[in-house]
Amino acid sequence: MTKSAMITICGRPNVGKSTLTNALVGEKIAIVSNKPQTTRNRITAIVNRGDTQFVLMDTPGFHKPRTRLGDYMVQVVRESVADVDAVLLMVEPVAAIGPQEEALIERLRESGAPAILLINKIDTVDKTRLLDVIALYSAAYDFDAVIPISAKTGEGLDELFTELEKYAVEGPHLFPDDMITDQPERQICAELVREKLLTCLDKEIPHGTAVEVTKFSERDDGIIDLEVTIYCEKDSHKGIIIGKKGAMLKKIGELARMDIDEFMGTKVYLQTWVKVKENWRDSMAQLRNFGYGER
């Protein structure tokens, strides 16, 4: 008998949610960087193990919003905690509960969904420190399970799947068995470009960028022609993104193309353009245009 489980992954920015998503799927479908608010939309990942299909929802980092884009991202998290079979609250191995975790725990109380505490990054600390973290969070909320993991090394992931199996419901799979994400190829390509913006640029500049695919076509020989436009909020930011004699934009494009080649499994010719849209993060029309619509 086939079974399915809908699972939401939530937590503060940079706690490792997207790294975990990629590790569970076994392929890179969610972009990763060391900067907060890397994930902007909910990303659905599909993992099949035996007769069970796990539908994992990677959500934006829960934070105090400063723009309408931030408002949208926080709302995505709030909605994703409801009407699922289980919620994974991912935290760092630190014996302190921050305001983001407090707000998410309160949302768990409201939703009533089964909740599993994931203590990530255990490869970076002495395991004896985990006892204090477990005691602190167990006093704050009655979690159904507590699982220490390392999304980076894979430690604890088999135990996580064993626990998630308990919440699977008998019935047909929700997605085809050969599907690993519901994201369109164009969207993943745009996100891979945005990941390189986050990697190569400093401070606020990458957070004020959006990427739009303006051309996606396949030749008879399988080569893909891809054109993307990078939008930023200021002319000064545009100059930094392009760089001296176009050096920065070339670097971003080359790094992105390598990942896109690997993801698409074929040669990709990538062209990048940079345009300015002032204050797009506070414009509902522009947010909808870039796929961050009202919920």
Description of each model-found segment:
Residues 58, 120, 150:
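Active-site glycine-centered loops adjacent to acidic/histidine catalytic or metal-binding residues
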Residues 48, 53, 75-146, 217-220:
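Conserved C-terminal guanine-recognition region of P-loop GTPase G domains, centered on the G4
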Residues 114, 123-181, 185:
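Canonical P-loop GTPase G-domain recognition
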